[in-house]
Amino acid sequence: MIEQFHLGRDADCPWEADKDDPGVRWRQLVSGDRTPSCGITQGVCEVAPGSELAPHHHAPQEVYYAIEGRAEIYRHGAWHPIEKGDMAYIPGGTTHGLRNRGSEPFVLVWTFPTDTFAEIEYVDG
């Protein structure tokens, strides 16, 4: 993929979901198979109240940046609070997850150092 300036819109990035994590959905904002980019993949994830992104791991490192709401992030065998304005750096191979026990959606921006989102193989934690 050739790198070039790209300006995207929410309307161009449909919500996606996985039956294994009901109440969790995401948008791929930057991914080399959808945008003229390489070396970075980024999107937005929303965890509905009462929902959970089950603990999992994957080879690439990842960064979360919380932009709305409150939730709990799983790391080092325990759940810890995460809220709007918090950032989490997740080393590759580290088991992590999210759960929202609140009454409002929890929304974060995620980033991987990969060309495409399809390169990331999620493994149950």
Which residue stretches match the model-derived regions?
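Short, charged/polar surface micro-motifs in flexible loops or helix N-caps
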Residues: 34-38, 47-51, 70, 114-117
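A short hydrophobic beta-strand segment most commonly corresponding to one strand
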Residues: 45, 89, 104-121
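Short acidic-glycine-tyrosine-enriched beta hairpin
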Residues: 77-92
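A short, N-terminal "cap"/entry segment at the start of jelly-roll beta-barrel domains
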Residues: 1-39, 120-125
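Short beta-strand His + acidic residue motifs that chelate non-heme Fe in jelly-roll/DSBH
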Residues: 54-55, 73-74, 90, 96-102
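Short, conserved beta-strand element in jelly-roll/cupin
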Residues: 44-48, 57-73, 111
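Conserved short histidine dyad/triad with adjacent acidic residue
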Residues: 26-31, 43-58, 92
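A generic "binding-loop/recognition-motif" signal
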Residues: 49, 59-60, 78, 94-95, ...
